[in-house]
A protein has these predicted regions:
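Glycine-rich phosphate/pyrophosphate-handling loop used in enzymes and phosphotransfer proteins
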Residues: 1-275
């Protein structure tokens, strides 16, 4: 599966051809300061269930504790094994939306901790043969699903933040005797969309078409194992297109890890008696 990668560095380093580390826009810092000021003046509410006087209640926090579960309904991911930490329903949905849309940046540390936990749990989902093949490659890339241009301009790189956290958890969980360097690298960019950049107001077919278009790969990945990371999976089409792009560039996609998985639409069908 691997092609004689160079010796592992003593600490993670960017791959050749990657741009410098992400720069956080000044607007993001200003927003954070304003939110901190508002938190002093306004009473806090749980981002999940709305309970007063707490930013995140213990019950909602426990929903991010795992364990990891396979996501069989992500048909769009093809044969890529997808695992999720929790279900994208109820309070979890409110948590993720609040965090990724910028209204609850105070959840960042909580989500990072959830990502680290997912990274620590993921090696347990692997068969021994697969784990051995990954270790022999000496490097494992943790690659986030690509963010759109608007989110990049705002500095809200949710999937990239999660990937960083997953990589930290993975590095701690992997057996110490295995000479494996775990690298989090944001090397995918979305392909130009058909029509306007924003997906709102578009038909479901057009949205699926845009998501399924393979992204661009910015760095050499031939012979390297890759774990894809995203915040939410619904149909799996985004993860599937990312895997196809990476595999076309010679990478070995070993799986995908998400914070939450939307339930299967088939599981939500309600049968009305007498109809």
């Amino acid at each position: 599966m691997c092609s004689n990668p160079p010796p592992s560095p003593s600490r993670p380093a960017p791959l050749p051809g990657l741009l410098p580390a992400r720069l956080r826009p000044l607007a993001s810092t200003t927003t954070s300061l304003l939110q901190e000021a508002a938190s002093v003046l306004l009473p806090a509410r749980c981002a999940g269930c709305g309970t007063w006087e707490t930013r995140l209640c213990l019950q909602c926090r426990s929903l991010l504790a795992g364990p990891l579960a396979p996501v069989p309904q992500a048909d769009g991911a093809g044969d890529l094994p997808v695992h999720a930490l929790t279900s994208y329903t109820g309070p979890v949905r409110a948590l993720v939306l609040g965090w990724k849309n910028g209204g609850r940046e105070d959840l960042t540390q909580t989500m990072r901790e959830a990502g680290e936990r997912a990274g620590q749990l993921w090696p347990r989902t692997l068969e021994a043969t697969t784990a051995g093949q990954i270790a022999r490659c000496s490097r494992l890339l943790v690659v986030p699903a690509p963010s759109g241009p608007t989110r990049r301009l705002r500095g809200r790189l949710v999937a990239a933040d999660l990937a960083d956290a997953v990589a930290r958890g993975l590095a701690r969980a992997w057996p110490e005797h295995a000479d494996l360097t775990v690298l989090s690298t944001d090397l995918l960019r979305r392909a130009p969309q058909i029509g306007a950049a924003h997906q709102s107001g578009r038909s479901a077919r057009r949205r699926r078409s845009n998501r399924a278009r393979p992204p661009r790969v910015l760095a050499p990945v031939a012979g390297l194992p890759v774990l894809l990371v995203d915040d939410v999976v619904t149909t799996g089409s985004t993860l599937g297109s990312c895997a196809r792009a990476l595999e076309s560039a010679g990478a070995w996609c070993v799986g995908a890890l998400v914070l939450a998985a939307a339930p299967s639409p088939r599981a939500q069908v309600t049968v009305v008696p007498g109809r």
